[in-house]
């Protein structure tokens, strides 16, 4: 379920703002989205895994707060990011 180092690096390369960026809001949201997608697949196969479901809800809440921050800071970056990630309609 955990992301491999190679997959993390791919996400960072795709969403980084500048060459050494590893912790910007865009990268954090992209990482959380990948983890949420993997955990959702796991929960579809393992419906009774309630501890993982709780973890999923925590990740969704964290991503929601980061998205709210990004929307407040830069509406254009927010719209572009949710379009690239395919979240929120």
From Swiss-Prot:
CDD domains: Ribosomal_S15p_S13e (cd00353). The keyword Cell membrane does not apply. It holds the Pfam family Ribosomal_S15. The keyword Ribosomal protein applies. PROSITE patterns: RIBOSOMAL_S15 (PS00362). One of its GO terms (cellular component) is cytosolic small ribosomal subunit. GO terms for biological process: translation. One of its GO terms (molecular function) is structural constituent of ribosome. SUPFAM superfamilies: S15/NS1 RNA-binding domain. SMART domains: Ribosomal_S15 (SM01387). Keywords: Ribonucleoprotein, Ribosomal protein, RNA-binding, rRNA-binding. NCBIfam families: S15_bact. Part of the 30S ribosomal subunit. Forms a bridge to the 50S subunit in the 70S ribosome, contacting the 23S rRNA. Belongs to the universal ribosomal protein uS15 family. One of the primary rRNA binding proteins, it binds directly to 16S rRNA where it helps nucleate assembly of the platform of the 30S subunit by binding and bridging several RNA helices of the 16S rRNA. Forms an intersubunit bridge (bridge B4) with the 23S rRNA of the 50S subunit in the ribosome. PANTHER family: RIBOSOMAL PROTEIN S15, BACTERIAL AND ORGANELLAR (PTHR23321), SMALL RIBOSOMAL SUBUNIT PROTEIN US15M (PTHR23321:SF26). HAMAP family: Ribosomal_uS15_B. This is Small ribosomal subunit protein uS15. It comes from Nostoc sp. (strain PCC 7120 / SAG 25.82 / UTEX 2576). The gene is rpsO.
């Amino acid at each position: 379920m955990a992301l491999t180092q190679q997959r993390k690096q791919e996400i960072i390369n795709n969403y980084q703002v500048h060459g050494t960026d590893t912790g910007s809001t865009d990268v954090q949201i992209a990482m959380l989205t990948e983890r949420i997608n993997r955990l959702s697949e796991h929960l579809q196969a393992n419906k009774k895994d309630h501890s993982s479901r709780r973890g999923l809800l925590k990740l969704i809440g964290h991503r929601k707060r980061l998205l709210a921050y990004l929307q407040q800071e830069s509406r254009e970056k927010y719209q572009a990011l949710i379009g690239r990630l395919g979240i929120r309609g």
